Amino acid sequence: EGKGSQFDPDIAEVMLSMIDEDEDYNMRQVEKMVSNILVVDDEKINIRLIENICKNEPLYKVIAAESGKQAIDIVGNQQIDLVLLDIEMPDMDGFQTLEEIRKITDVPVIFVTAYKDYKLIKRARQMGVEDYITKPFLPIVFLETLYGVIG
């Protein structure tokens, strides 16, 4: 009387190890769900803006490239789930960069650009671009576009 229930120490040890394993498993599942988003823009301020918008989204990890060539190198060496690609860049434009990326992978691509030209949008769609975001953009519109492509 007055004594609480006790677990058998062996059973308690097994249960604790199962909980630890389950936590490790859950952490691995969360890591698998994180989407690596490659932002390709020669303007650092645009990269910082996107990083700031995405920092409150725990399942989005932003990776930055300041040129098409750098983007191609990253795509060839890392798991990338989405590319946000500027059109107007000095070394290679967005279309040239996209052509090179397509030689490596069919990762979804969204153009993020100041251009609002219908012909450019049509060309982008023909090349397999998933969507098109014009700068400047509202953060909510930006995030909704990302959700629509990668969830």
Q: Can you describe what each PLM-predicted range is?
A:
Residues 64-73, 94:
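Helix N-cap/capping motif at the beta->alpha junctions
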Residues 96, 116-131, 144:
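Alpha4 helix (beta4-alpha4-beta5 surface) of REC/receiver domains from two-component response regulators
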